[in-house]
Amino acid sequence: MIMAAGSTGERPFFEIITSIRYWIIHAVTLPAIFIAGFLFVYTGLAYDAFGTPRPDSYFQSSESKAPVVTQRYEAKSQLDLRTK
């Protein structure tokens, strides 16, 4: 087969996205990826996987606002006092 200059030998993108085979495969995989991502976040597994606190655990129940660190070099000790 003789290819045109500059051709990589791959099918043109337009030909791929207009094929029935492409849409049969992607009609299943694209919604499946979306649903998997939704469930990953909705079930809380994303919080566990990445070690992020859940929205209801950012503040302690006794606090009414976000904790503020006032001394730059004593931040660790201030946060330790907060968690006790």
Curated annotation (Swiss-Prot):
Taxonomic lineage of the native organism: Bacteria, Bacillati, Cyanobacteriota, Cyanophyceae, Synechococcales
Cofactor: binding comment: With its partner (PsbF) binds heme. PSII binds additional chlorophylls, carotenoids and specific lipids.
Binding site for heme: 26
One of the Pfam families matching this protein, by short name: Cytochrom_B559
InterPro entries assigned: PSII_cyt_b559_asu, PSII_cyt_b559_asu_sf, PSII_cyt_b559_N, PSII_cytb559_asu_lum
Needed cofactors: heme b
Molecular function in Gene Ontology: electron transfer activity; heme binding; iron ion binding
Family designation: Belongs to the PsbE/PsbF family.
Oligomer and partners: Heterodimer of an alpha subunit and a beta subunit. PSII is composed of 1 copy each of membrane proteins PsbA, PsbB, PsbC, PsbD, PsbE, PsbF, PsbH, PsbI, PsbJ, PsbK, PsbL, PsbM, PsbT, PsbX, PsbY, Psb30/Ycf12, peripheral proteins PsbO, CyanoQ (PsbQ), PsbU, PsbV and a large number of cofactors. It forms dimeric complexes.
Chief location bin: membrane
GO terms under cellular component: photosystem II; plasma membrane-derived thylakoid membrane
Membrane topology value: Single-pass membrane protein
Top-level division of the source organism's lineage: Bacteria
SUPFAM superfamilies (alphabetical): Cytochrome b559 subunits
Function: This b-type cytochrome is tightly associated with the reaction center of photosystem II (PSII). PSII is a light-driven water:plastoquinone oxidoreductase that uses light energy to abstract electrons from H(2)O, generating O(2) and a proton gradient subsequently used for ATP formation. It consists of a core antenna complex that captures photons, and an electron transfer chain that converts photonic excitation into a charge separation.
GO annotation, biological process: photosynthetic electron transport chain
Key words, A-Z: Electron transport, Heme, Iron, Membrane, Metal-binding, Photosynthesis, Photosystem II, Thylakoid, Transmembrane, Transmembrane helix, Transport
Transmembrane parts of this sequence: 24-38
Record-given protein name: Cytochrome b559 subunit alpha
